[in-house]
Amino acid sequence: AAAVLLLAMISTAVYLYWKQSPSVSIPMVWQTEPLPGSARAFLVFASGETVNLEDERNFSPQQDSDVRLDNKDNTLTIKSGQPASVATEEYQTLVVPRGGEYKLVLEDGSRVYLNSNTKLHFPLVFAGEKRVVHLEGEAYFEVAFDSLKPFIVMTGGMEVQVLGTKFNIKAYTDDQAIFTTLVSGSVQIKERESAHTALLRPDEQCIYTTHDGRMRIHTVDPQVS
């Protein structure tokens, strides 16, 4: 019965493809919040310094005293007093272990909800012409709008580019596919090797299979839980 319900939610073409590829499962949970877990995370600075966010409240990285990090209510917020034009774009890593979850507010105001067993590589300040982060695992993004500086999520063999929107990406390294689900706005997905692109609209999900680099788009129901 569960299989019938799942297949009814996707198009005939996608159904036929996945019927021939049963090793890849299609997640039907519309996830706009992290899965239940405990608020556990570690922050690894570019310098190699590691901070357990369960223990620390407010602090500054050793390599940049102009940046302030506020850590409260299971949320790490980055505040920079340094203009982006003079900042250096060194990448830090927020690590959420298995069974944990955490929220990150980036320097531009964008919010990222990290799920269990997830890593996000990000700069303290977006100094270049693009806002680029790297994701391993699953996260829900609420991207602050900036028409002059697109926001790009690099994951696996693909990249997702937006100006301001809400979307979820599931890209665990052990999975055979990357799932990008759009809640609002629009996103452009690009397969890096072939440069093939696809445009997502609200209530659509892109399934990118890592073994062949193919992208398929189908409609999803945002009320499914």
Predicted regions and their residues:
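A residue-level detector for the "anchor" residue at the start of short, highly conserved motifs
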Residues: A1, I10-S225
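Conserved beta/loop motifs at nucleotide-recognition and modification sites
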Residues: L6
